[in-house]
């Protein structure tokens, strides 16, 4: 039986859906920290999230009839909720508001993995040559070079910089291999942000 999340984790904001993919008046279901949730958008377009009882994926529902709701935020194109009492605001992604930036959801894929393990794998460049062969890495270029890590109490995040890796096809437009530099931000135990130069 899964262990219940600690109160600190329950009080964090967690992503539950790409807001643009959440239909109006149709139930979507998900699990958050082993807690069954249901969600939809009301006629006003605002997301509504609640503890799932007998609702099924695809059921029609009037969001106005949902009285016991979980807290909801929309930010960065996603719907966020909290199972406890949210104590903090969401972490900033200042680039999201840049007027010349195109922001999009690239879809989501359900995988059977814990949130900490998903973040750990996302941060691990060592898998590039073996999992993303001939795109993000290839043998014999398997070295993960030394990089810098900063734990910032002021920003409440971990920042890894100078993360360099030789990539055969770092971008769709790439015609030759190049060394790419990554910056990883971990501003939340279950969220990571990637900046890539190519």
Question: What spans do the regions from the language model cover?
Answer:
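C-terminal catalytic domain of Rieske-type non-heme iron oxygenases
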Residues: 43, 87-198
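N-terminal pre-ligand scaffold of iron-sulfur
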Residues: 1-53, 61-86, 167
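Detector for the c-type heme attachment site
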Residues: 56
């Amino acid at each position: 039986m899964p262990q219940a999340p600690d109160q600190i984790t329950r009080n964090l904001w967690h992503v539950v859906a790409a807001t643009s993919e959440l239909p109006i008046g149709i139930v979507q279901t998900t699990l958050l920290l082993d807690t069954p949730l249901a969600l939809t958008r009301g006629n006003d377009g605002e997301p509504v999230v609640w503890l799932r009882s007998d609702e099924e994926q695809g059921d029609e529902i009037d969001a106005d009839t949902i009285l016991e709701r979980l807290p909801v935020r929309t930010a960065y194109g996603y719907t966020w909720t909290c199972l406890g009492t949210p104590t903090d605001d969401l972490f900033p992604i200042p680039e999201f508001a840049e007027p010349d930036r195109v922001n999009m959801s690239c879809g989501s894929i359900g995988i059977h993995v814990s949130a900490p393990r998903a973040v750990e794998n996302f941060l691990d460049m060592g898998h590039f040559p073996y999992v993303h062969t001939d795109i993000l890495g290839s043998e014999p270029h398997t070295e993960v070079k030394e990089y810098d890590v900063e734990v910032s109490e002021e920003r409440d995040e971990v920042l890894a910089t100078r993360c360099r890796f030789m990539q055969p096809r770092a971008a769709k437009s790439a015609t030759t291999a190049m060394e790419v530099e990554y910056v990883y931000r971990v501003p939340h135990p279950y969220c990571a942000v990637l900046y890539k130069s190519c």
